[in-house]
């Protein structure tokens, strides 16, 4: 068997229907568009979201909220992800970036207390959760806010 001898499985390929090519085709004469009317015309049809004149869904619901331009983009990371570092390492946002644990520093880095820290680390970031501080000190490390 060669690549040039390969054939599609029976029934895998279906010929496209040629609309308007005789009434025997089943899609002749009006080509599935019905008689006259907006949808039978060239370029006919209603725009997306048009509901026949009734108030569209998009306009029935009220506007809500706003975008706070002063919102802080704080990058969060869980405690168990810090186990990749050697004991005694000083963990900073720059080190987390280099290690690929975070994608960007943004407006700061926050350590969350999910998981268990198995090594004594000095962690210097912008914010900590209460449980994260407790677990870092329990492991023999230090949590410093920069």
Swiss-Prot record:
Please verify whether the record's keywords include Ribonucleoprotein: yes
- A biological process (GO) annotation for this entry? translation
- Which PROSITE patterns does the annotation name? RIBOSOMAL_L15
Q: Any idea what this protein is called?
A: Large ribosomal subunit protein uL15
* Job description of the protein: Binds to the 23S rRNA.
| Protein's gene | rplO
Sorted keywords for this record are: Ribonucleoprotein, Ribosomal protein, RNA-binding, rRNA-binding
**Record's GO cellular component terms:** cytosolic large ribosomal subunit
Q: Which NCBIfam families match?
A: rplO_bact
List the GO molecular function terms. Answer: rRNA binding; structural constituent of ribosome
Origin organism lineage: Bacteria, Bacillati, Bacillota, Clostridia, Eubacteriales
Question: HAMAP family recorded for this chain?
Answer: Ribosomal_uL15
Pfam families noted in UniProt: Ribosomal_L27A
Q: How does it assemble?
A: Part of the 50S ribosomal subunit.
> Where does the record place the region Disordered?
1-58
Task: Kindly indicate whether the keyword Ribonucleoprotein belongs to this entry.
Answer: yes
The record's family statement is: Belongs to the universal ribosomal protein uL15 family.
Q: Where is the composition biased (Gly residues)?
A: 21-31, 42-52
Lineage, top-rank taxon, reads Bacteria
């Amino acid at each position: 068997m060669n690549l040039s001898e390969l054939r599609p499985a029976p029934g895998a390929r279906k010929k496209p229907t040629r609309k308007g090519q005789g009434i025997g085709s089943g899609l002749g004469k009006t080509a599935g568009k019905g008689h006259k009317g907006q949808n039978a015309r060239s370029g006919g049809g209603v725009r997306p979201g048009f509901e026949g004149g009734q108030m569209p869904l998009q306009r029935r619901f009220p506007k809500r909220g706003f975008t706070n331009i002063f919102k802080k983009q704080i990058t969060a990371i869980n405690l168990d992800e810090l186990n990749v570092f050697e004991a005694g390492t000083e963990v900073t946002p720059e080190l987390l970036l280099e290690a690929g644990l975070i994608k960007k520093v943004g407006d700061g880095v926050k350590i969350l207390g999910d998981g268990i820290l198995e090594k004594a680390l000095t962690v210097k970031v912008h914010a900590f959760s209460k449980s994260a501080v407790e677990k870092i000190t329990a492991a023999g490390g230090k949590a410093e806010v920069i």
